[in-house]
């Protein structure tokens, strides 16, 4: 089970298995950290700023005022033409026909190795007039498929979720 809660400039992401928290990530105005198997990792400097900048309910809204973003062209993503937008170390792909975000590639470094993580967004469904991808496929060396079972908007979110 994965639970993601967001508010302006705040994000809480928790992954549970058999009722136990496996990993958790918190971002708020003051800090950002990740917990995994009881170990806490605090983010500082550029990592903290990047995480805080992305901690929005709808990250795409921040793109409207981002002077660093650039349209690099149209690319084919899984058979669909998509606008490619370069945003720092990430490239965002939006379907030319639907306007939906269909993929995101991020340049990352882990243990001294540079790699590209690509995430695909599929099966968009309507929730209270907004569209959300119900299928997310992450390629991080292995392919991980996530299926959304429920999206709630403006329900059950408190300040305590972001501490």
Each language-model region and where it sits:
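Short, surface-exposed beta-strand-loop junctions and turns on beta-sheet-rich folds
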Residues: 18-21, 40-42, 100-101, 110
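A generic beta-sheet turn/junction motif
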Residues: 6-8, 17-19, 78, 87-89, ...
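Flexible, processing/modification-adjacent segments and terminal tails
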Residues: 26-89, 109-114, 163
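Gly/Pro-enriched, hydrophobic low-complexity segments
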Residues: 80-162
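Generic beta-strand structural signal
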Residues: 6, 26-27, 76, 94, ...
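Extracytoplasmic
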Residues: 8-10, 66, 80, 131
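N-terminal mature ectodomain segment of secretory-pathway/periplasmic proteins
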Residues: 1-38, 70
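Short, surface-exposed linear segments at secondary-structure transitions and domain or protein termini
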Residues: 9-13, 33, 52-55, 126-129, ...
């Amino acid at each position: 089970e994965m639970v993601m809660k967001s508010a302006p400039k705040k994000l809480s992401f928790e992954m549970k298995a058999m009722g136990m928290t496996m990993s958790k990530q918190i971002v708020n105005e003051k800090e950002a950290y990740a917990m995994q198997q009881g170990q806490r990792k605090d983010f500082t400097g550029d990592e903290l700023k990047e995480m805080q900048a992305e901690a929005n309910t709808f990250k795409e809204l921040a793109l409207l005022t981002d002077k660093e973003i650039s349209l690099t062209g149209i690319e084919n993503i899984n058979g669909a033409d998509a606008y490619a937008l370069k945003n720092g170390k990430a490239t965002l792909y939006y379907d030319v026909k639907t306007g939906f975000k269909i993929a995101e590639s991020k340049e990352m470094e882990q243990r001294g190795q540079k790699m590209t993580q690509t995430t695909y967004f599929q099966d968009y469904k309507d929730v209270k007039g907004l569209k959300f991808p119900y299928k997310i496929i992450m390629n991080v060396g292995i392919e991980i498929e996530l299926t959304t079972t429920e999206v709630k908007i403006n329900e059950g979110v408190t300040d305590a979720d972001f501490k």
